[in-house]
Amino acid sequence: MPKTKKKDSSSDSDSGPDDRIKPASKKAKESDAPNSDPKDSGENGATSWTLEGLRQVRINEFRGRKSVDIREFYDKGGQILPGKKGISLSLIQWKKLLEVAEEVTRAIEN
């Protein structure tokens, strides 16, 4: 037999899912500007284009090498920060992607 017993709760409140406060859902604001217009992020001078919501294509430079970053961003206290979901392509990989883009489009449509 256990030495200690659990105290019975005499509380009338139920701590079930009904009592939990649900956080307000955040919806990404769509910009009124056309998607093809580049915008300057301001922090590091990277040029970016909005794909949808908070998904963006950015041109970054790291250690003297440029890359194309396709990434999902998130809003933290009014500051837009890069998320984990995304890919960074070298310029060679980006050019190869553009070469096969038409074939990929045809495969999607068929």
From Swiss-Prot:
CC annotations in GO: nucleus; transcription regulator complex
Name of the protein: RNA polymerase II transcriptional coactivator
GO biological process, one term: positive regulation of transcription initiation by RNA polymerase II
Basic and acidic residues bias: start-end ranges: 17-42
Stated family: Belongs to the transcriptional coactivator PC4 family.
GO molecular function list: single-stranded DNA binding; transcription coactivator activity
Region of interest: Disordered: 1-50
Localisation per UniProt entry: Nucleus
Function noted in UniProt: General coactivator that functions cooperatively with TAFs and mediates functional interactions between upstream activators and the general transcriptional machinery. Binds single-stranded DNA. Binds specifically to the NssBF element, a short nucleotide sequence of the 1731 retrotransposon, to repress promoter activity.
InterPro entries listed in its UniProt record: PC4_C (IPR003173), ssDNA-bd_transcriptional_reg (IPR009044), Sub1/Tcp4-like (IPR045125)
Keyword terms: Activator, DNA-binding, Nucleus, Repressor, Transcription, Transcription regulation
